[in-house]
Every structure is written in C-alpha cells, then in structure tokens.
Amino acid sequence: MADVLSVGVNLEAFSQAISAIQALRSSVSRVFDCLKDGMRNKETLEGREKAFIANFQDNLHSVNRDLNELERLSNLVGKPSENHPLHNSGLLSLDPVQDKTPLYSQLLQAYKWSNKLQYHAGLASGLLNQQSLKRSANQMGVSAKRRPKAQPTTLVLPPQYVDDVISRIDRMFPEMSIHLSRPNGTSAMLLVTLGKVLKVIVVMRSLFIDRTIVKGYNESVYTEDGKLDIWSKSSYQVFQKVTDHATTALLHYQLPQMPDVVVRSFMTWLRSYIKLFQAPCQRCGKFLQDGLPPTWRDFRTLEAFHDTCRQ
C-alpha cells in the first residue's frame, strides 16, 4: 500500500504536515482555555483586562502561525498519481469494505483449494502408477504384428488348488470362519464370518476376488431361494462404509502372478475388523465421529482411522 501512496507524494512533507496539524490543534485548545479561564490572577480590574487581552492575542497569533505553516506544507505534499503502477491490480492493496467485497477471503480460499487439489492429484498419480487397476496380467499395447492372446494360466487354476488355499487361510485365523460354495459352476463364493461382528460375501473368479459385500452379523445374507445375496447392500451405514473400503483394498492388493498371496493379504486386512467397535481412531483418539466408528484400516499397519482422519 505504501508503494501506491508514494507515487507523486512527498512523504517527508506529509509527515511534517501531520505534526503541523497537531500543533494547530494545541494552539486552538490554548485559545479556548484562555477564554475559559477569563481574567484571573490580577488584583485590579485594569490589570486583569490587559493580561487577558495580551494572552488572548498571543494565542491567536499562534493559531494563525500554525495555520499558515499547515497551508504551506499542504502545497508541498502533492497529490497521488491517479495511474497505479499495477493498473487495476494495484487496487487490490487498498482496504475494501469486508462485508461488501470479501475479495481477500475468497482469494485465500481459492488458493488453499488449489493447493489441496494439487496435493491430492499428486498422491493419486503416484498410487495409480504403482498399482495396476487391471484384473489380469495382460498389458495393453498395440503392436504392428498382432499376436494371438494366450489365456493367462493364473485364471484357470484347478478347483482343488483353490480349495486348499482357502482351507489354509481358514486355519490361519481362528476367529474367522470361511464357508466355500460353488453355486454357479467352478467359480467360488465365500461366506466369511468374522467373530460376532460382521459377515462378508466374497465373489471369486478362480483365485481373483471380483466383489465383496459386507453386512452385519445379524443381517440376512441369503435370498428367498436360499442363495447368497451378492447384490443388496447392508442396511447399516457403518457396513456400507466397510464395503467401500473393502473394494478399495481389492484394488490395492494386486499381484496377478501370485494370487494366493493376494487372497491371504486381503483376508489379513479383513481380519483387522474384529475390533471394529472397540478400537479408537489412531489420529483423533475418539471411538465415534458423526455416529460412526473408525471404519478405515491402513493397508500396511492395519491401524484404525475414521474416514476423515486418514487423509
């Protein structure tokens, strides 16, 4: 703001003019004090009149002198240039009425939003570069000479091998029971019961997990004809949140060449929900936030976080 005011303005004369204004105010105050006190401190009436007139004239001369000095300095101050060095952007340095033109707060909010967007975009880019979102080992590419696509061997594992992997995982976690069924042919469907906390329906394609649905322990997981209900969501918001996080975990645990490791890692992550309603958030230390417990589990440390605290 000082740079804008300094254009065409004598700052030294401006400072002296302020001092002259203070001196003029003092002189005027002395005039009124003289009028207020009147004729005092003299024995005779004639002496009091002469002293009052002399004092009053001195005060008026002081006012006249200070006023002349202020007029002289006002001519030396000069006028600020109407052309701002930054054109219209130079007006931003002025002090607008906050209620009418909240420009500064809006610019600050936009700046914070832009920085946050750039930060999250960088994180998303790094994660997408590390994790492949494709569910197979095939890689996209266009070659000049097309080759016949070979069926990945990891997608056609024998059912006995899948049963053996699921059985070993079931023995790893005593508090988790896994029931395997094949209602639609060779593709397996798992009903995972985690203590008395929740139930998870896992739809598999060989050893690749395609879909997960998390429901409460007391909720029905079967349709009217007795089959596993793989489409309806849970009636509780907390288990809907866990379903969303489980879908995110499927995209995180991706290793097409070793699908058994992927299933074991996912089940280890799922087992961390055994204390869904007992573990506090590792960041805020609270058990509930907006009526929900910490529904997020870190993929590496398995620590509990609220959905908003993990960011």
Curated annotation (Swiss-Prot):
The modification N6-methyllysine is found at K134. One of its GO terms (cellular component) is cytosol. This is Mediator of RNA polymerase II transcription subunit 27. The keyword S-adenosyl-L-methionine does not apply. The modification Phosphoserine is found at S132. GO terms for molecular function: transcription coactivator activity; ubiquitin protein ligase activity. GO terms for biological process: positive regulation of transcription elongation by RNA polymerase II; positive regulation of transcription initiation by RNA polymerase II; protein ubiquitination; regulation of transcription by RNA polymerase II; RNA polymerase II preinitiation complex assembly; somatic stem cell population maintenance. Keywords: Activator, Methylation, Nucleus, Phosphoprotein, Transcription, Transcription regulation. It is found in: Nucleus. Component of the Mediator complex, a coactivator involved in the regulated transcription of nearly all RNA polymerase II-dependent genes. Mediator functions as a bridge to convey information from gene-specific regulatory proteins to the basal RNA polymerase II transcription machinery. Mediator is recruited to promoters by direct interactions with regulatory proteins and serves as a scaffold for the assembly of a functional preinitiation complex with RNA polymerase II and the general transcription factors. Belongs to the Mediator complex subunit 27 family. The keyword Membrane does not apply. It comes from Mus musculus (Mouse). Component of the Mediator complex, which is composed of MED1, MED4, MED6, MED7, MED8, MED9, MED10, MED11, MED12, MED13, MED13L, MED14, MED15, MED16, MED17, MED18, MED19, MED20, MED21, MED22, MED23, MED24, MED25, MED26, MED27, MED29, MED30, MED31, CCNC, CDK8 and CDC2L6/CDK11. The MED12, MED13, CCNC and CDK8 subunits form a distinct module termed the CDK8 module. Mediator containing the CDK8 module is less active than Mediator lacking this module in supporting transcriptional activation.
